[in-house]
């Protein structure tokens, strides 16, 4: 049995893969693959409409929010967000992980050419991002602020800002990179001005980025780039140019699968259960360590851990691969191991990994 712990692209629900396989050569008796049909066809319009409606239902997205299906990966949003929201304003960044740092760096780069200010509220980098940054509201000028950007789940470092810990402001919008825990943790969309997420972790396959934006944040002023203008993209129903049709189709199937599992809250409960199995073993062990300082900040999607030495870490991932536990090697910037246990990852895979971890500890402690 193979268990894919990849951080993204990552495991997909078997039911979704089978449906893709079943329809690949003949989509809805059209005689064509879904990869071949026009994005302007009635058949594809139905696909994207259903995907949007299902996502709106799953996340209880209010009607005053627009949903976009875009290309470019979540990293493209590091530029699009300040270009659309921060002109003439101050953009604040909470840097608690490598991707938050990249988002801030991109805003700083844009500030050299555009009328905007990118302001870091601080960073936990000196501590290897092993905890989240506590936000000092006294540093924020809400009146002239565009937004506060944060990452809800740090895929590399294994930390999360859960719903109960989100900062609240009277008027400053929250912008969230939700790439690695969207649909895995139940967030109240109305708490955010804008949410974006790459699809290849919990939503489907690489090549698609979802953006959820509150209508009042759409910019009517002429922008630097039509392709990166939320207003234009909304007006064109995500079809200003040819969208990533196959990735949208797969995401739509994933949304239906999430509904069939009972929705986001049910999956969050299962994700907590899976993560707790690993954290319980790590906490009770003298062999394994989890570097996250505060237990209430531990991710339930990406569980990071180390053994007593780098040599043992390498041996662990090697032996794990031989046993069918794939992609457990930690990110190159952190080392150690990382078990990415997104929505589609089965509980039995975590149970089997825990057994293997116990056996490895017995053999090498």
Swiss-Prot record:
GO terms for cellular component: cytoplasm. Keywords: Amino-acid biosynthesis, Aminotransferase, Cytoplasm, Pyridoxal phosphate, Pyridoxine biosynthesis, Serine biosynthesis, Transferase. It catalyses: O-phospho-L-serine + 2-oxoglutarate = 3-phosphooxypyruvate + L-glutamate; 4-(phosphooxy)-L-threonine + 2-oxoglutarate = (R)-3-hydroxy-2-oxo-4-phosphooxybutanoate + L-glutamate. InterPro entries: Aminotrans_V_dom, Aminotrans_V_PyrdxlP_BS, Pser_aminoTfrase, PyrdxlP-dep_Trfase, PyrdxlP-dep_Trfase_major, PyrdxlP-dep_Trfase_small. Binds 1 pyridoxal phosphate per subunit. One of its GO terms (molecular function) is pyridoxal phosphate binding. Coiled coil: none annotated. Pyridoxal 5'-phosphate binds at residues 74-75, 99, 155, 177, 200, 241-242. Pfam families: Aminotran_5 (PF00266). The modification N6-(pyridoxal phosphate)lysine is found at residue 201. Pathway: Amino-acid biosynthesis; L-serine biosynthesis; L-serine from 3-phospho-D-glycerate: step 2/3. It is found in: Cytoplasm. The keyword Transcription regulation does not apply. L-glutamate binds at residue 40. Belongs to the class-V pyridoxal-phosphate-dependent aminotransferase family. SerC subfamily. Catalyzes the reversible conversion of 3-phosphohydroxypyruvate to phosphoserine and of 3-hydroxy-2-oxo-4-phosphonooxybutanoate to phosphohydroxythreonine. This is Phosphoserine aminotransferase. The lineage of its organism: Bacteria, Bacillati, Bacillota, Bacilli, Lactobacillales. The gene is serC.
